[in-house]
From Swiss-Prot:
This is RNA-binding protein YbxF. Found associated with the 50S subunit of the ribosome during exponential growth but not during stationary phase. Keywords: Cytoplasm, Ribonucleoprotein, Ribosomal protein, RNA-binding. NCBIfam families: PRK13602.1. Disruption phenotype: None; has no effect on viability, growth or sporulation at low, normal or elevated temperatures. The lineage of its organism: Bacteria, Bacillati, Bacillota, Bacilli, Bacillales. RNA-binding protein that recognizes the K-turn motif present in ribosomal RNA, but also in box C/D and box C'/D' sRNAs. One of its GO terms (cellular component) is ribosome. HAMAP family: Ribosomal_eL8_Bact. InterPro entries: Ribosomal_eL30-like_sf, Ribosomal_eL8/eL30/eS12/Gad45, RNA_bf_YbxF-like. GO terms for molecular function: RNA binding. It comes from Bacillus subtilis (strain 168).
Length: 82
């Protein structure tokens, strides 16, 4: 499951804005996006990742994604870094 990938990853970037920046730098291996996040926020992340041929995984909950990242709040998007 993608929550496990995030919690076991050595290096991650949390949040949509930071994920977009990392995608533009070309340092992203995979993107994980929460289905319950606002599509207005996550659509740019998903489209940019797909344009670059980067795998996009969808998870059910922002809260669980945030917990997998080790933070107390939800996370809409997370980038797993190369």
């Amino acid at each position: 499951m993608s929550y496990d990938k995030v919690s076991q990853a050595k290096s991650i970037i949390i949040g949509t804005k930071q994920t977009v920046k990392a995608l533009k730098r070309g340092s992203v291996k995979e993107v994980v996006v929460a289905k319950d996040a606002d599509p207005i926020l996550t659509s740019s992340v998903v489209s940019l990742a797909e344009d670059q041929g980067i795998s996009v995984s969808m998870v059910e909950s922002m809260k669980k994604l945030g917990k997998a990242c080790g933070i107390e709040v939800g996370a809409a998007a997370v980038a797993i870094i190369l």
